[in-house]
Amino acid sequence: MSNLLLYLLAYLIGGIPFGYVIAKYFAGVNIKEHGSGNIGATNVLRVLKKIDPKRAKVLAGLTLFLDAFKGAFVILVAKFIGVCDATLWTLAVIVIIGHCFSPFLKFEGGKGVATTAGALLVLIPYAVLVGLVVWFIMAKTVKISSLSSLTGILVGIFSAYILYLHPSIESHAPLWIIAFIIVYKHRENIYRLVTGQEKRVV
């Protein structure tokens, strides 16, 4: 299988908008028209708690799992067929781009945190676990999803420099490309954080 075909498949798989589909199918809601308009688990939880509070956490959890799973799935399949490390990292970047700029939603999409965690869990698991611990602590204490996610991502990247001194592709550049995408997708959240307007998840 050529790399170009792999890249296309990674982009299409990454673009599957699970949050949008789940909210539409199970609650009859266009998630893009409610709350923050984001298709991620946080907005699914926030919006569905008002409509179907009994199932909101389950559906948000399912969204989180599937968004992470598609990132891991792409990398696991690529490893199984034996592609090189450089291609694996390229696929990781592309599956995240697919999620953030979905071809199925007119190139709009989520913010990439769960898909990043899934893809990188296969490539640099220890760094991801460090980031997840930080994210979890922040989420439980500060209860601001965007701040928790951004902090977890940055801590995970910096920990990769310690835990993976000799990265398989001789560079940590893909991590910073991914970080840039996620920060870009959170630009409105960052503005609200700076101005004290960002909402908590309760």
Language-model segment annotations:
Residues 51, 59-65, 70-103, 134-136, ...:
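Nucleotide and nucleotide-moiety/phosphate-recognizing core
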Residues 129, 145-153, 166-178:
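Loop-to-transmembrane alpha-helix initiation sites
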Residues 63-76, 113, 129-132, 151-156, ...:
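Core segments of transmembrane alpha-helices
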Residues 1-27:
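N-terminal signal-anchor transmembrane alpha helix
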Residues 29-40, 104-117, 144-152:
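Short, non-helical or kinked segments that cap or interrupt transmembrane helices
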Residues 1-9, 73-90, 121-128, 161-174:
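Helix-coil boundary and interhelical linker segments in multi-pass alpha-helical membrane proteins
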Residues 45-52, 78-81, 98, 112-142, ...:
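Interfacial segments of multi-pass membrane proteins
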Residues 22-57, 191-202:
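Cytosolic, membrane-interface loops and tails of multi-pass inner-membrane proteins
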